[in-house]
């Protein structure tokens, strides 16, 4: 492993960790940054799976007490049973649509221009959602009904379009469906666990031939970096949403998306995978 390859792994690990749980699209940022630093091919497919696992481990660690309480209480406690059922209900739409459409979406939509467009559109929707008057009827994740979970699960499917943001769609969807800001954010984190692990297992099996012993050091750098920066991002976001709205992320999405579109339109950057 040369120094530049290590630097690429470090950069992409940081990007994944910082963006995975913020409503700004980690997949979109990965596509853009990987394009800029010329990190692609079979190694990149396997590498992306590894750094996503690093990010999800950070959330598992951050919410380990809640997870342990649910696991211990699952046989007898109705609250734990309802929470688990809600996660399964919210998880299933992504499983069904992911298996059916994942390859098609990856082939046609994984490019810089799709990402930029989705960033802008998603940012506008976030601003609209934030400016609406919210009637909170669900204060905590334990108060959610199966209908709340199903609606959030359906909204999560929008994130199959790169640049949309899984966390952004589930959080904003939760707010529109009557969840408190804290409940919407926490449920988005919990839903990420089965969703991302399921996607990683599916992709890992599908691309199992791309995992090579020679790439272990690269994977290790990306995994550790992603874990550390995801932990920082999750803790920062939980503190941030206690006193702020998501408008700042919306404006960031719009500005970043427009910048990408401008560089493409004026030919300042030759995006390797750009499509009109």
Swiss-Prot record:
Membrane-spanning parts: 43-63, 85-105, 109-129, 183-203, 218-238, 254-274
Gene Ontology cellular-component terms listed:
plasma membrane
Name listed for the protein in its UniProt record: Undecaprenyl-diphosphatase
Q: What is its EC number?
A: 3.6.1.27
UniProt cross-references to InterPro entries, sorted A to Z: UppP (IPR003824)
- Which organism encodes this protein? Pseudomonas syringae pv. tomato (strain ATCC BAA-871 / DC3000)
Q: What is one Gene Ontology biological process annotated in the Swiss-Prot or TrEMBL record? A: cell wall organization
Q: Which NCBIfam families does the UniProt record give?
A: PRK00281.1-2, PRK00281.1-4, undec_PP_bacA
């Amino acid at each position: 492993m040369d120094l530049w390859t290590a630097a690429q792994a470090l950069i992409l690990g940081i990007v994944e960790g910082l963006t995975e749980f913020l409503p700004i699209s980690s997949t979109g940022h990965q596509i853009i940054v990987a394009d800029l630093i010329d990190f692609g091919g079979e190694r990149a497919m396997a590498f992306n799976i590894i750094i996503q696992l690093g990010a999800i481990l950070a959330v598992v660690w951050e919410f380990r007490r809640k997870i342990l309480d649910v696991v211990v209480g699952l046989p007898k406690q109705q609250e734990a049973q309802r929470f688990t059922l809600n996660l399964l209900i919210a998880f299933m739409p992504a499983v069904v649509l992911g298996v059916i459409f994942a390859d098609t979406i990856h082939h046609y939509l994984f490019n810089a221009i799709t990402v930029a467009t989705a960033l802008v559109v998603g940012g506008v929707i976030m601003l609209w959602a934030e400016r609406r008057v919210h009637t909170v009827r669900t204060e905590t994740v334990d108060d959610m009904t199966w209908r709340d979970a199903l609606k959030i699960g359906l909204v999560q499917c929008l994130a199959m379009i790169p640049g949309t943001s899984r966390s952004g769609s589930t959080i904003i969807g939760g707010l529109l469906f009557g969840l408190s800001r804290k409940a919407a954010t926490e449920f988005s984190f919990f839903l990420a666990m089965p969703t991302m692990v399921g996607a990683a297992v599916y992709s890992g099996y599908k691309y199992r031939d791309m995992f090579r012993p020679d790439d272990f050091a690269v994977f290790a750098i990306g995994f550790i970096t992603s874990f550390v920066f995801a932990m920082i991002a999750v803790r920062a976001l939980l503190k941030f949403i206690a006193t702020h709205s998501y408008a700042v992320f919306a404006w960031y999405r719009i500005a970043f998306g427009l910048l990408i579109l401008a560089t493409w339109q004026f030919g300042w950057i030759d995006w390797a995978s750009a499509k009109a």
